[in-house]
Amino acid sequence: MSFVSGAVPDSFNKEGQVWNNCLYQWDRQKLDNYKYWTDKLNKTLDLYNYLRIDHFVGFFKYWVIKKGDSALKGEWKQGPKSEFFDKISKNVDLDKLLAEDLGVILKETKSLLNKYNIPGMKVLQQLSLIHI
């Protein structure tokens, strides 16, 4: 049985979303201290000054759907959380990362962004004039 990624049903999409992206095998990647990610991030940062990490909350939890099912039948799985960033921070310049942290943000996600000084995002249309 194979699974794909997606998004939980919410106020923006009552059916949720099936993205059909493959899922990372975090337990296997942990065995070599996330070398795949370290290599991938460093190669990208060799080419660009900064890197935006989309769906940053996915490092903490992600929506898993059995291939062929609707997003309504998905379930939450735990990501590698702060352990991932603790490991890769030894070999990757986290100061060059930007987190797409829009939508629901977990308390532990915000703590990690603060710990490593990784900036999040603000969308002008979503800010009140008081924040400008």
Model-flagged regions — what are they?
Residues M1-I130:
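Alpha-amylase-like alpha-glycosidases and glucanotransferases acting on alpha-linked glucans and related
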